[in-house]
Amino acid sequence: MSSLRNLLCRLISPLCKHGSYSHLQLFLIGDVSKSENCVLSMFVTNKKFLSKDLTDNFYRKFLKVWLKCDLDSRNQIKAIFNKMMMTKNFFLLLAYLYFLYRQCKVLKILALYKIQRLTWKQIVERFKQYPIHKLNQLLEIPSFVSFNDLYYYLFQQQLMLPISTHCNIPCMKLFCLRNFEQCNDITLRYAHRASNLTYQDIFHGCSLTVPCGNFIFAMAMAMIENYCYSFDRFLIPLENNNLVPIVLNKQEKHQLPKILTFALTTVLKRSLTSSIISLPVLCFCKTKCLRYAKIDSYLTVICSKCGHCLNSGKERLKGKQTFSLSSMFYYRDRQEKNIIYSMHTDLLYCSLCGGQRLTLEKVYELYEYSVSGIQVKSVSWKAIIGTNSACTILNDSVKFDAIVACSCRTCYSMIHLQNLTINKLLKLISHSTEFQCQDCQNIYRETCLDLEDCGEICTGCKISQLAKCTQHGCDTW
């Protein structure tokens, strides 16, 4: 007799026609190239959860597989659930169990916070103990409420597809910590004389119950933050391989997070958040002429804490996944990100997270450096995306927008590219691609190589002249 797992794989797996790692992609970012190619897309928790068109389409495909299946397997699956005939609602239950089996496979390679890593055998045992009246209700009227109730019974968690990795895993819990969650405030008390009160004594008396905070902890936080942002490599000691407690719980008030928590948070913010992507230069023929260069051209302001670009203007860049950070300023949904200048403190702030650590980066840059006494010239191209989670676009099925430098050699302006994929973006700086702004399409400017009486050719034109471009591609020098 075949096991339930083998029967589900035999009946449901033919409905998943896609490439490798598509299920992993679905569980993490909720995106597949085409929803009709994966039966698990029916359970994505959005407005189209168990949509009629999608379920009808998969049910028709399933009936073809069901009729081709041998009689013994069909009788076994009906005997396990005590059903006389196959219906659409029965198919949805089988597809949901297959979804749980695939989640077990995903959890074998990922450790997700608060999600129990159950084996398939444990899930089957718990499923057998599920109240029969609730199972009949699910088969009678399948809905998100009924499937969510079954999921909560098995995992003690709400059903969520994709899995909310950006707010549930320990990294993101650390990532979103506020300063007041790091340690408790302390109260400063004074002992003063009862008579002969001076003006200073009056102020001391008014400040008896004013919380001043832990100034030693604040100084240690500043030192660690400066160190982590100044050096590329550092060691953080972990006591007994344990990062808990991450957030101060009401039940565990005696267990206060240590300075280690803040150090891990700082490292994660520096390592994970980014809206800048360095592009590989496949051909140097697009190296710009320095005769038209400007000092402040291609400068971008990046917040080191939240990773967003703050001077992208009013461009609305498409991007799905974003690290949601706690804001200390009022922030409307998806409004223009900018820099706030405080006239009281004479400091600059990020309008999104309130961070004061702002850095400048160039989207295009030609620079020189020395290696063992040899002068080396290098060209750097970068792209700005609309999300601070650049790692989520590393999938060819994810489409996004980006701001890059204009490909014209005499132009130092930017251009907004739409509906890009990671493969298209990585091949952008090549000989065969052109992405010019509107001004460059109407205005012709001469470079050093175009001038007949040019006395000295700039460095950019020299690099462009050395690039070996052919009809079929290009070679780097």
Swiss-Prot record:
Matches recorded under InterPro entries: UL49
Lineage, uppermost ranks: Viruses, Duplodnaviria, Heunggongvirae, Peploviricota, Herviviricetes
Gene Ontology process terms (BP): viral process
Gene name linked to the record: U33
GO cellular component: viral tegument
Similarity comment: Belongs to the herpesviridae UL49 family.
Pfam families for this protein: Herpes_UL49_1
Name by which UniProt lists this protein: Protein U33
